[in-house]
């Protein structure tokens, strides 16, 4: 069984796999073996990052920069925003989103009839319902997604049909298949390729409409004369895909004809959109501190992480008692910190933009879609703020805008 399929099955309430997962996730495991393993990995991962920070700081000094953060902003070609804009984003998210998540957690706790909400309780369906099943098989998945996109605008359905007719996607999960999902532009044919691991879940719908947004972006910008114009920064590329996630949601009745299932799917999508914003802000704020203080110790690093996390999560209603040592190193699960430093906040900017696009679509659907196509046609021929302006939205990080 593939990991994607296992994850899908584990959301259910009456199957053997779920019982196995519960058995290996008991309190004794978490408080003894889990803590021991975490401690071993934690030291090794801390040592690795310490070495990376020292080398990266040396690279920055050799290049004439005060720290690696300033060097990296330059190398990432961040011409349209500064570190202060990032700080504004952190502050705006911290003041606006956690109170909403706190209210959602209160409802979750009540539905699950718990005396305290533990971290793992946030990953289960609060109504203890079986996982949603939006499609029967891959052919059904393809047909419904094309129908969904056609309802938004017929041209979008034609774009996906072009991929389907040419065999330009590999959607179904199978044993031995590489993990993940992506849209890969093919600049000669100008027909992109979509790869993912569908297992029959709501997450598969979210993934394909996301990658479908990228695919439409690739096709609409195909006539730009230079490949470099189509090489998009994430702030722009993800605006297309994340916007399509939310816009398409207005047509998810194709996948969920039952009204209760449809509401449940939309609620899940919106909760995930909101919950990712504080995490992005936490990770980015942490990285600024790491490279502004390159000689810090591992203990100082974990203390700082905990301080930042508590700024955003102190009142979210999740009980971490007995798990403090694990919480101090939860940053270690974010591979970006190791592999692609400072590459992450772009997704937060794009997510805010996508919410603005969805708001625009709810109010004036045709105007919003015209603006959607207008910004995609630009590729990367304009500065990011101008591209967002073409979309009819702002490239803003203020508390008021959020």
Predicted regions and their residues:
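Short, glycine/acidic-rich hinge or "gate" loops at secondary-structure transitions
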Residues: 62-71, 106-121, 158-164, 224-230, ...
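Catalytic Zn2+-binding segment of zinc metalloproteases
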Residues: 213-227, 247
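C-terminal, non-catalytic "cap/extension" segments appended to globular domains
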Residues: 208, 216, 246, 254, ...
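A well-structured
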Residues: 1-132, 144
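Glycine- and acidic
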Residues: 34-41, 82-87, 123-134, 154, ...
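Post-HExxH zinc-binding segment in Zn-dependent metallohydrolases
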Residues: 95-96, 232-261, 269, 275, ...
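Active-site-adjacent "gating/activation" loops or surface patches in catalytic cores
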Residues: 18-26, 130, 134-209, 213-218, ...
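A glycine-rich phosphate-binding loop feature that marks nucleotide/adenosyl-phosphate handling sites
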Residues: 108-128, 162-172, 233-236, 265-270, ...
């Amino acid at each position: 069984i593939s990991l994607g399929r296992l994850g899908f099955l584990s959301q259910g309430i009456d199957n053997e796999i779920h019982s196995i997962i519960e058995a290996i996730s008991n309190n004794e495991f978490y408080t003894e073996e889990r803590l021991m393993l975490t401690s071993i990995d934690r030291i090794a991962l801390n040592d690795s990052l310490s070495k990376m920070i020292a080398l990266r700081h040396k690279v920055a000094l050799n290049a004439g920069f005060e720290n690696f953060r300033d060097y990296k902003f330059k190398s990432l070609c961040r011409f349209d925003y500064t570190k202060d804009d990032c700080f504004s984003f952190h502050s705006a998210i911290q003041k606006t989103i956690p109170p909403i998540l706190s209210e959602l957690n209160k409802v979750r706790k009540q539905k699950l009839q718990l005396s305290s909400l533990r971290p793992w309780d946030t990953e289960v369906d609060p109504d203890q319902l079986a996982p949603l099943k939006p499609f029967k098989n891959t052919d059904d998945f393809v047909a419904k997604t094309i129908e969904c996109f056609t309802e938004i605008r017929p041209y979008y359905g034609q774009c996906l049909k072009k991929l389907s007719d040419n065999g330009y996607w590999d959607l179904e999960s199978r044993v031995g298949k590489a993990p993940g999902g992506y849209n890969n532009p093919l600049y000669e044919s100008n027909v992109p390729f979509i790869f993912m691991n569908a297992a029959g879940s709501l997450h598969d719908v979210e993934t394909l409409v996301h990658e479908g947004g990228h695919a439409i972006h690739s096709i609409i910008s195909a006539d730009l004369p230079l490949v470099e114009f189509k090489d998009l920064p994430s702030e722009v590329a993800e605006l297309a895909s994340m916007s399509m996630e939310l816009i398409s949601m207005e047509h998810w009745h194709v996948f969920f004809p039952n009204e209760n299932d449809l509401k449940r799917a939309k609620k899940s999508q919106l909760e995930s959109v909101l919950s990712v914003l504080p995490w992005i802000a936490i990770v980015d704020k942490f990285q600024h501190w790491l490279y502004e203080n390159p000689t810090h110790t591992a203990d100082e690093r974990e203390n700082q992480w905990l301080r930042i996390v508590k700024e955003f999560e102190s009142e979210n209603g999740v009980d971490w008692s007995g798990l403090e040592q694990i919480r101090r190193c939860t940053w270690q699960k974010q591979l970006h910190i190791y592999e692609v430093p400072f590459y992450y906040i772009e997704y937060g900017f794009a997510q805010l933009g996508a919410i603005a696009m969805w708001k625009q679509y709810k109010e004036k659907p045709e105007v919003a879609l015209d603006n959607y196509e207008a910004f995609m046609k630009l590729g990367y021929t304009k500065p990011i703020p101008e591209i967002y302006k073409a979309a009819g939205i702002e490239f803003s990080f203020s508390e008021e805008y959020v």
